[in-house]
A protein has these predicted regions:
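Helix-turn-helix
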Residues: 17, 21, 25-59, 63
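Hydrophobic alpha-helical connector segments
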Residues: 77-108, 146, 154-161, 190
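A contiguous binding-surface segment within folded domains or other stable secondary-structure elements
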Residues: 111-141
Length: 203
């Protein structure tokens, strides 16, 4: 599709329909398990029509991953050096849990990519993502060194937030099966995680 002209309303809608359909397919089957024919069928479009918007399966997958990373990393970027350290970190935890609840397919897509060695995201993870984490880790380390939060390894603190929030999306079937239908995993996880991190960070 030509990129030097603004999209019409119909083109914008069709592009969104394709990405939504592809997200569902990739999150369920991974990159290797999905074909352009399958995405086109899920989107309700012909394959030639789909190829008007995206040149390949890889292009669709890359567009999804790019959108996901922007969404996923925004809360980490928003840590405010001028804010209260414990409040900033707890807000980050809440935002990450909310993203897992509102975007479970995106979380599973990212997990699937990483579990396969991040063949398409490797340079981004080793570059911009690693740099952002290093910057935020330096901020958290500074807070700890100033005695504003308890001493913690900042990288592993960030990893723990990823693990403890994204688990509820990536392993949703397991969580719901173990807890049973009477439980709301996200409503219960929120207070638990807040207590956990308050205790971890308290000085």
């Amino acid at each position: 599709m030509p990129h030097d002209q603004p999209l019409s309303r119909i083109q914008t809608r069709n592009r969104r329909v394709i990405l939504d359909a592809a997200l569902e397919e990739f999150a369920a089957a991974g990159f290797a398990g999905v074909t352009l024919d399958r995405i086109a069928a899920a989107a309700g479009l012909s394959k030639p029509n789909l190829l008007y918007y995206f040149a390949s399966k890889e292009a669709i997958y890359t567009a999804l991953l790019d959108d996901l990373l922007d969404l996923w990393l925004a809360p980490l970027r928003e840590l405010d050096p001028a804010g209260d350290p414990q409040a900033e970190i707890l807000t980050y935890v809440r935002k990450k849990l909310a993203l897992s609840q509102s975007h479970p397919r995106e979380s599973r897509l990212f997990a699937n990519e990483v579990l396969h060695g991040a063949p398409r995201l490797g340079p981004v993870i080793a570059g911009p993502l690693a740099q952002l984490v290093a910057d935020r880790a330096a901020l958290i380390r500074g807070w700890a060194q100033a005695g504003r939060i308890a001493p913690v390894d900042p990288h592993h603190l960030i990893f723990s937030v990823w693990a403890l929030t994204q688990h509820y999306a990536d392993f949703e079937a397991q969580v719901r099966a173990v807890l049973g239908p009477a439980h709301d995993p996200y409503a219960e996880a929120g207070p638990f995680l807040e207590t956990l991190y308050r205790r971890l960070l308290a000085v």
